[in-house]
Amino acid sequence: SVLFKQVNYYIDTPDFKLKEHRSALRIRVKDNQYEMTLKTPAKVGLLEYNYIVDIKPEMNLIISNDNLPDDIRQIIVEQFGVKDTTLSILGALTTYRQETKYKGDLLVLDKSEYFDTTDYELEFEVKDYNQGLQKLQSLLNELNLEHHQPLNKVQRFFKKKETLSNNIN
């Protein structure tokens, strides 16, 4: 089994303009590399734009639109109307991931830490959905666990961030 750590720094405007457009911008730090990703809604699932960048993320860092990769800048400026220097790093989510094979598929346990919160998520990456569902239900029964459909990491992060922001005002 493999254990690794990655840190996602989430970027938005103070009034959550990207979130308003059901989109998310992050810089992921993994293996001493900085990868910027913009996720936007598609007809099915999400469109992802990924670029290696030189921006070293830190809390509250203001990111000029000029420092964004062209594709990302075009979308957030032209489609979302984000003004220059209104983007900043709002916080970090650190994930410790343990991966192991289980009955021929990949079982992933994530421990996520953000703000004052720690949560856990079990993911099962499968080739065949129906067979995977049966294997997962069998494992959950064996471990006496219940299945709950969680918000994804980005949604959990921003829900907590908004709660904290509302408590300040």
Where are these regions (language model features)?
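Phosphate-end processing signature that detects enzymes handling 5′-triphosphorylated RNA
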Residues: S1-N169
